[in-house]
């Protein structure tokens, strides 16, 4: 499946626009990562634990969006946008949302 932030796919004709599809992931922040991140903030480093959590959440949101597109018969998603939101009373949750337009593009000729 082609997934792109572009509004079209170069060299491909869009045959059908299906609908907007979403993938959402909400993940909690680990206590041990918080301690490590606090120390890195103090000393001026990067928090690998948080970065890994962010990457995993983004990839899962995209996978979920792709699956929803497949479920309605699409073979591509265009105009993809990814949003991040910190949630919870103590900002202990991260929500990642991937959205785009599910479409059917012409079949690949080989």
Curated annotation (Swiss-Prot):
It holds the Pfam family YbjQ_1. It comes from the Bacteria. Gene3D superfamilies: Hypothetical protein apc22750. Chain B. SUPFAM superfamilies: YbjQ-like (SSF117782). Belongs to the UPF0145 family. This is UPF0145 protein. It comes from Listeria ivanovii. The lineage of its organism: Bacteria, Bacillati, Bacillota, Bacilli, Bacillales.
